[in-house]
Amino acid sequence: MEEAELVKGRLQAITDKRKIQEEISQKRLKIEEEKLKHQHLKKKALREKWLLDGIGSGKEHEEMRKQNQQDQHQTQVLEQSILRLEKEIQDLEKAELQISANEEAILKKLKSIEKTTEDIIRSVKVEKEENPEESIEDIYANIPDLPSSYIPSRLRKERNEGPDDEQNRKALYAMEIKVEKDLKTGESVVLSSIPLPSDDFKSTGIKVYEDRQKSVYAVSSNQNTTYNGTDGLAPVEVEDLLRQASERNSKSPTEYHEPVYANPFCRPVTPQRERVISPGPNFQERIMMKTNGLGNHANESAHNMTDGLSERRSNGPTHTSPTRPTPQPRSMVQQVEEMVHTQQKRMASPWEESSNRQNEHEVSPRMELSPSRASPGKSGPQCSSPTCQEETEDVRYNIVHSLPSDVDDTEPVTMIFMGYQQADDNEEEKKLLTGYDGVIHAELVVIDDEAEDNEGQTERPSYHPVAPYNQVYQPPKPTPLPRKRAEVRPYENTNHKSPHKNSISLKEQEERLGSPARHSPLDVPVAGDGTEDPSLTALRIRMAKLGKKVI
């Protein structure tokens, strides 16, 4: 009771102290307001007094004098109110100090009487020891809404505990692991792991490990538990065995293969019969234009494709030419073709043809040389069979096989110039590329540049460095007509003396470019005045304007 009274007195002291503090704060705010009013009235009285000195006697003077007296009286009242409030604040502060002193005294008494946490725990233990007959059931019996079937967890645990508790615990999960131990190295390898129902598991064998979470029993293969060489397992060994068993169970039966890269030139795999195209000059005569850069590129592609197709068409064994190692893309797969001695037509799928074309285009011209054209310095098997001789036929017929099989030979072909490629002009290359002249003939050559479309609309005379040909008049660029051109016979001179473009002699052009002319049996016949084809001359002039060098 004394402790409760002390606590009550302390709470009352705290409440009174709080009220006094609030009252003190209110009085201080009121004092501030009174001081502001007092200052204002004092200034007003001084101003009115100064005005009275300058005004003579009269009614107005009397009114101002009365107002000044009222202001002075109000100022005195405010001064007295301020002094009174300050005195009250001092009294309240003294009362607050007194209450604080009483609160401290009550707190000291309360600390001397109040029990600590340790004392409370100690007293509870003493009470429990004094009343041992009181059980948990008596405590829960006082709860009104508790069902009669409820049994506290502590009481259930006490009832379930017994002398053989460690042996009577039921296994939640069991697994049979067959382990093979190497007696030389001491390593254990898990051969198989079979999960077992926990109900069917019986603690048979010798216990070799137990950590209150899992138990390991060693059983021999013949179910004999008394055998020699059984020792306890270390925790590391048990964890290793469990890890191997779990890895063995979690292995996926999925078989993985090497990465497969898609072929960007793949077509539907519907088999089609290969069209047999007899090599001849019919189609080439229609698409030949003499330009070293474009002819070189087109002839290289045609030569590469012809070698691959001639190997497929040949009846003899396949010959591999000596090549220099060059980096190939990862997606390119080396293909080994096996030729079969047969006279029947071979069926080929379109995707195989496109894949072969891709490989043939990406290989450099030096790698596509046949053994019969290889230089003497390079080592490799020499080929003198008729099959190899067929491969070394005139390259002007090979471009036919590089085109798709669905292209009609009678329709014109549009060839777009994509640019030049730097190439070393050495004599060894010329010898290896015997039979290549870099010439393509065409019925109609249209050279167009979007940047100079406006310039081609106006007619202007062009200047030629050679005096006899400097008065050639250049009309507007001809527009190709959508009509079929007449067939041109082989080696027919297609040069017609017409003032379409400037003409320049071959000798002078070669002197300007600084490279000797390549004479070939397929050169375009030169006109009687020593000039070459106007279309070729226009192409050379156009390339010179663009800053490109015609090789």
Swiss-Prot record:
Q: Which residues form a coiled coil?
A: 12-106
Task: Pinpoint the Glycyl lysine isopeptide (Lys-Gly) (interchain with G-Cter in SUMO1) cross-link.
Answer: K178
Q: Which InterPro entries match?
A: Paralemmin
Keywords assigned by UniProt?
Acetylation, Cell projection, Coiled coil, Cytoplasm, Isopeptide bond, Phosphoprotein, Synapse, Ubl conjugation
Task: Please list the residue ranges that the record marks as compositionally biased, kind Basic and acidic residues.
Answer: 247-258, 354-365
Positions carrying N-acetylmethionine: M1
Cross-link Glycyl lysine isopeptide (Lys-Gly) (interchain with G-Cter in SUMO2) position reads: K125, K178
A GO cellular component entry from the record = cytoplasm
Q: Where in the cell is it found?
A: Cytoplasm; Cell projection, Dendrite; Cell projection, Dendritic spine
Annotated positions of the Phosphothreonine modification = T270
Which positions carry Phosphoserine? S135, S321, S349, S370, S375, S384, S385, S498, S515, S520
Task: Cite the post-translational modification comment.
Answer: Phosphorylated.
Tissue spec. comment: Ubiquitous. Expressed at highest levels in the heart and lung.
- Origin, by domain of life? Eukaryota
Q: What biological process terms from GO does the record include?
A: regulation of cell shape
Compositionally skewed regions (Polar residues) per UniProt = 341-353
Task: Report residue spans for region: Disordered.
Answer: 247-266, 294-390, 451-533
Query: Which family does the record assign?
Result: Belongs to the paralemmin family.
The UniProt subunit note reads as follows: Interacts with GLUL.
**The name this protein goes by in its record:** Palmdelphin
Organism annotation: Mus musculus
Output the lineage of the source organism: Eukaryota, Metazoa, Chordata, Craniata, Vertebrata
